[in-house]
Amino acid sequence: MASQLALKSRIASTGSLEKIFNAQEMIAASHIAQARQLALDSKPYTDAIFDAVQTLVSHTHISHPIVKKDEGNPRVAVLALTADRGMAGAYTSSIIRETEDLLARLEGEGKQPQLYVYGRRGVSYYHYRNRPLAQSWEGDTEKPGVEVANAISRALLKAYMEPVDEGGVAELYIVYTEFINMVVQKVRVLRMLPVEVVKEDKSHLNVPDTTTAPQVRPLYSFEPSLDEVLDTVLPRYVRSRIHECLFEAAASEVACRQNAMHTATENARDLINDLTRKLNASRQASITQELTEIIGSADALNKKEE
């Protein structure tokens, strides 16, 4: 009897968890479409800004913080985009693991990383381990707004533009999760500043190799001056990059949560079915034992009367 009561209790508690998991899955499913659309909508503007920066970097000989910054400065800034809530599988742990690998690699190169974290789970992780944070932000990781993107970009840009003797950094890195599709989300490390020239890969276009031929590049005119143009482009580039990464991370978080809750719901249902079979088997065994005892008692009485 005690075993049956324990099984009934486990079935009831597992059923409650199954309802919670299923509700979380449905909530995530209702958010994923908007999160995906925001991530897609941010790409055209970010790509346009990035193309403009690439054009400036590759077609001009410039000495500006956007491409070169304090080469002797060992300090670098690392921004990790984590989640506010759990129930998202290995989402935050994957970000933290990649961040730790990046920090170890940078320290191995003789650099001094300064860590910035967005998301309550990541902030709690580092606070619990008494790890210093240069700055942190919490709230709305599933639906990041313009305000948080502006706050993060201002803090990172301020750290990047400060002189060496005032604690400025020489590089900016972002660790985030790129949304590929509902099943695949990949953790990425992006060096945002200084900007690196990305060479276009034309191997898939089946065009002849013209690298040995003289290349005619467009003539650009900058008004009022090149430095003023770059000073205007730099904060917009940083803000757009961070905004895009926030949207990618939000879509990835929601997708991970939906997948994790779907798996948890299925596991809870399987466990309920298994426990129900055990309960039925226990009931059957109990009934069989009672019938055996009744039949045995009846046989004993019959023999006694004879």
UniProtKB/Swiss-Prot annotation:
Keywords: ATP synthesis, Cell membrane, CF(1), Hydrogen ion transport, Ion transport, Membrane, Transport. It comes from Bifidobacterium animalis subsp. lactis (strain AD011). CDD domains: F1-ATPase_gamma. Pfam families: ATP-synt. This is ATP synthase gamma chain. It comes from the Bacteria. GO terms for cellular component: plasma membrane; proton-transporting ATP synthase complex. Its main location: membrane.
